[in-house]
Design a protein with these regions (language model features):
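A generic structural motif
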Residues: 34-47, 177-185, 200-202
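N-terminal ordered "arm"
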Residues: 2-57
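Short coil/turn segments at secondary-structure boundaries
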Residues: 79-84, 182, 235-242
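Charged, alpha-helical interface segments at or near domain boundaries
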Residues: 39-134
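Acidic, Ser/Thr-rich peripheral helices and adjacent loops at domain boundaries
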Residues: 53-57, 194-208
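Short, hydrophobic/amphipathic alpha-helical patches that form generic packing surfaces
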Residues: 18-29, 98-102, 166-170, 220-228
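Internal, well-folded beta-alpha domain core
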Residues: 109-200
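Long, compositionally biased intrinsically disordered terminal regions
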Residues: 176, 187-188, 192, 207-262
Length: 262
């Protein structure tokens, strides 16, 4: 009878909570891991031999999965899963699901089994997200607006805004600041002395260049002039520059605004 079972594709929301809820449903359904796949929405291509089920986000269920990962595997496993879940990848749901099947059965020792594709895949996704997050700790640029709020526009391959918000809450705890993911229409807002808040705001479109404080505008111009004046023409190496500072980050870095030859 097993060979006649239809494949179940669990379509999850493209978020950490969404994927964790998919994992919860897969483990509690008892349908069989061999007959289930996790896919990240909003759209999944099925076939004549598969049934697609939409997984609703449930914070309580997601929390149970997090607790199980930490207690039955390790905190490191949760770190890897969390990072991987924010990757720009259509395969991340299935990779996380297959990894957790192995890890719940074998414990934390599976984390070092790099010869297993599911383990290697999880590490690769997590490493890619972590690397971009580390880059943006240095590449993200805040600018002072006329209302004394520090504003930063974010462009990233992976969904790393939350990790940046946590970092800058520690670094700038007594500042009012906003991190705006301009491509995903997401905003992280921090009031001085408080925890950051997250909102999804598709209408958050106003160009902050029109609201820069006078001192910020002057500093931006001085900074551009400085970076241009210290550059040595004979030592320009655009290829190396793009390796050290990928071009996708240039758009919202003041020192790169309208610089000639870039």
């Amino acid at each position: 009878m097993e060979q006649n079972k239809r494949m179940h594709i669990l379509m999850c929301q493209n978020s950490t909570e969404g994927i964790l809820c998919g994992v919860y449903e897969a483990f509690t359904s008892r349908y069989g891991h061999a007959w289930q796949k996790l896919a990240v929405g909003p759209y999944v291509n099925g076939d004549l031999f598969s049934d697609i089920y939409s997984v609703e986000v449930n914070t309580e269920k997601a929390g149970k999965v997090v607790k199980a990962i930490i207690s039955k595997i390790s905190e490191e496993a949760w770190y890897l899963v969390h990072m991987a879940s924010e990757a720009d990848s259509q395969e991340k749901g299935e990779i996380i699901y297959r990894f957790l099947i192995l890890a719940f059965a074998n414990g934390r020792k599976v984390l070092n089994a790099m010869s297993i594709p599911e383990v290697m895949g999880l590490h690769q996704l997590s490493r890619s997200v972590s690397r971009e997050t580390q880059h943006l700790y240095g590449f993200l640029r805040f600018q002072e607006l006329q209302n004394d709020i520090l504003y930063a526009r974010l462009v990233s391959k992976h969904h790393v805004g939350m990790f940046l918000a946590e970092h800058f809450q520690d670094r700038l705890p007594m500042e009012n600041w906003v991190i705006h993911d301009v491509e995903r229409d997401e905003v992280w807002i921090h009031r001085a002395g408080e925890d950051w808040l997250y909102i999804r705001h598709p209408d958050f479109r106003q160009d902050p260049q029109m609201m820069l404080s006078s001192s910020e505008y002057a500093f931006t111009e001085w900074w551009k002039t400085f970076t241009e004046s210290v550059a040595i023409l004979e030592r320009r190496n655009p290829k190396l520059q793009m390796q050290m500072l990928p071009k996708r980050y240039w758009k919202y870095m003041p020192e790169m605004f309208t610089n000639p030859g870039r």
